[in-house]
Regions:
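Conserved G/P- and acidic residue-centered "switch" motifs that form tight phosphate/ATP-binding loops
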Residues: 57, 92, 121
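Acetyl-CoA-dependent GNAT
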Residues: 6-74, 98-99, 135, 141-144
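Conserved acetyl-CoA pyrophosphate-binding loop and the N-cap/start of the following alpha-helix
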Residues: 88, 92-100
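Conserved acyl-donor/pantetheine-binding loop and adjacent beta-alpha core of acyl/acetyltransferases
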Residues: 73-76, 104
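Conserved active-site alpha-helix within GNAT-family acetyltransferase domains
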Residues: 95, 119-138
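Conserved GNAT acetyl-CoA-binding A-motif
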Residues: 106-117
Length: 144
């Protein structure tokens, strides 16, 4: 059975291993200081929130999400990061995390819950196409 809970101080090592796996999947990484800053922000739970998914007591998935204002409607929930350990994929971990974030969004009363993925991430998109609606938007990043 998959158990989902908020991140706790004792989760640091397992969280960081999964967070680094997530960054490696997207061929990016950050300094150790950035991991420390992110971990501290997740534990504070003010600007960003974190969840862990466990199978048989082992952390196998993480989700980071935040709430933000929108210009034309009520606040939104953005699923910023979602990662499942490769050996735990296909067992419902990502779905459990997505559902847990949805519950947090409902409890907060937000109007919209959304996330992004790479266009060629076929396994993730197969899941997302089953549980959510693709709206056809394309994202652009302007380097500052």
């Amino acid at each position: 059975m998959i158990e989902v809970s908020s991140l706790k101080p004792d989760d640091r090592a397992e969280w960081e291993a999964l967070a680094r796996g997530y960054k490696a999947f997207y061929e990016t990484d950050h300094s150790d200081e950035r991991y420390e800053e992110t971990w501290s922000a997740l534990l504070a739970g003010e600007r960003i929130h974190g969840l862990a998914a466990r199978l048989d007591g082992r952390m196998v998935g993480i989700a980071h999400y935040l709430f933000h204002a929108q210009g034309w409607s009520a606040d939104a929930c953005y699923l910023h990061d979602l990662f499942t350990a490769p050996d735990a994929r296909g067992q419902g971990v990502a779905t459990a995390l997505i559902d847990a974030v949805a519950e947090a969004a409902r409890a907060r009363g937000v109007a919209k819950y959304y996330w992004l993925t790479k266009q060629d991430n076929r396994p993730a998109r197969a899941l997302y196409d089953r549980i959510a609606a693709f709206r056809g938007f394309v994202r652009y990043d302007y380097t500052l």
